[in-house]
């Protein structure tokens, strides 16, 4: 587990300060929560940002993705800034849906790890443990037809990603050494 989550209220206060500085006005985070269903590659925090604007209270649901501080991460090389950059480039240069990004912090001094924020979309989160295609609500609460629609939409979206010109997105510099994908990973 990430040590900073042990002090959830301290994390909440640090995020309030950071977001306030980036937005140029005071914000509050009434409560932080960690979703029951979460991925294995990042620590995920859910919260609402609230603030006053024109005499009215405003609110935005947000997700914070924190780089894990574990000894054996899911990925051999972990670059949270690159994840953010890729989503930003795709969001600005295509009509492929990506999260609305709200900020990136690469300085680990604030929370002990890098993190980024994105607008939260309401919905159910498929679990990684157990894998959602083997057990859990997607297997037991959806019909075969619903799963087919979901999987086809995922494949169609993946195909759209592969049609993007990585050079136009500025990713030609991301060359990994090795001729094959396996060699590049090793």
Language-model features: where?
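ATP-binding pocket architecture of kinase catalytic cores
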Residues: 33-186
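Juxta-kinase regulatory segment immediately upstream of eukaryotic protein kinase catalytic domains
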Residues: 1-32
């Amino acid at each position: 587990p990430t040590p900073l989550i042990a002090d959830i209220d301290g994390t909440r206060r640090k995020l309030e300060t950071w977001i306030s500085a980036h937005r140029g006005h005071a914000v509050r985070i009434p409560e932080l929560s960690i979703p029951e269903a979460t991925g294995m590659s990042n620590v995920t925090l859910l919260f609402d940002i609230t603030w006053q604007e024109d005499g009215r209270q405003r609110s935005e649901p947000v997700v914070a993705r924190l780089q894990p501080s574990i000894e054996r991460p899911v990925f051999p090389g972990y670059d949270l800034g690159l994840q953010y950059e890729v989503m930003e480039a795709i969001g600005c240069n295509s009509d492929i849906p990506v999260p609305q990004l709200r900020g990136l912090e690469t300085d680990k001094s604030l929370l002990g790890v890098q993190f980024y924020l994105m607008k939260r979309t309401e919905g159910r989160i498929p679990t990684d443990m157990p894998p959602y295609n083997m057990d859990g609500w997607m297997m037991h609460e959806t019909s075969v037809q619903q799963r087919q629609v979901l999987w086809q939409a995922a494949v169609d979206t993946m195909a759209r990603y592969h049609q993007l010109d990585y050079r136009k997105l500025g990713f030609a510099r991301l060359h990994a050494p090795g001729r094959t994908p396996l060699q590049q990973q090793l």
